[in-house]
């Protein structure tokens, strides 16, 4: 039997409703008569750790729209939040998610390889990406350690928090951000070569004191007083600041644009007779209404990289001098399998050197 990990939470159970529209309007992927009428269909969402609040708002907005359009039928959402890679592994191992909201594309591929996502999710609107945000530094008030760029993370005695890349998608983004900035020749004193990027990562990870299970755990650890700087999602820092926390954002001159996909796990959704609802929810995330929620509640940037680079003044998002994507530095397949996370990749070797 599949067991929930301690970081997985279930929430947002709303119990009323009347119709069976979810199954009676099933797509061609669901055979006629296969789904009995459902009074209150249940959709399960597994998501990465830092989007709890924004997905609560998105789910509520979708439920209202669905109810109005489908004769008062109330859709129930069960949600689970944790490190992105851990979530993907759990779904591949049997957690019955109908939809996954993950930090990065390679985590979706874990579920694809398990045969649970059978469609080409990259043909969805915006290539399946629903929200974006850059990697930034979260520092103490006044930035007493004067951390402004990636090379500053190598200074002697600095204490850095970043999650564990074996469990957290955000951790992988943090590593790719430093690697890419170096490779693009944007880090002072660091050669724009693979060896230069590896040396930078070695220096950074010599100063990493804690690698938590998720970006959310890492930020909470930092907010409890541990460390001098946390490397994390910008939207996470801005959300904390908006909530009255003393976090302070430092946006490095060169950083990666995190692109987060949300995808229907179609084999599960079909089995649970909620495929039309799951599809509708994912499509809803690309609408102007949902994108406004992502930006004003979640402090994400616009999906378009050019617009994301400019930032949004009202949300206190600064422009980025050099905002790049994974495609600009070889793409995820190359980054995961060879150049960064492969057996001889820059991070793999840097971590060995840092520990040695």
Language-model region placement:
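N-terminal segment of the mature folded domain
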Residues: 29-168, 309, 347-348, 352-356
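Bacterial signal peptide processing site
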Residues: 24-26
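C-terminal motif of bacterial Sec signal peptides marking the signal peptidase cleavage site
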Residues: 19-22
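Short beta-strand->loop
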Residues: 46-48, 120-130, 139-140, 159-193, 204-208, 241, 245-256, ...
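Extracellular/periplasmic juxtamembrane helices and adjacent flexible linkers that interface
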Residues: 2, 269-356
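Short helix-loop capping/hinge motifs at secondary-structure junctions, enriched
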Residues: 142-148, 167, 180-189, 268-278
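Ligand-binding pocket segment of bilobal, Venus flytrap-like solute-binding proteins
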Residues: 186-253, 261
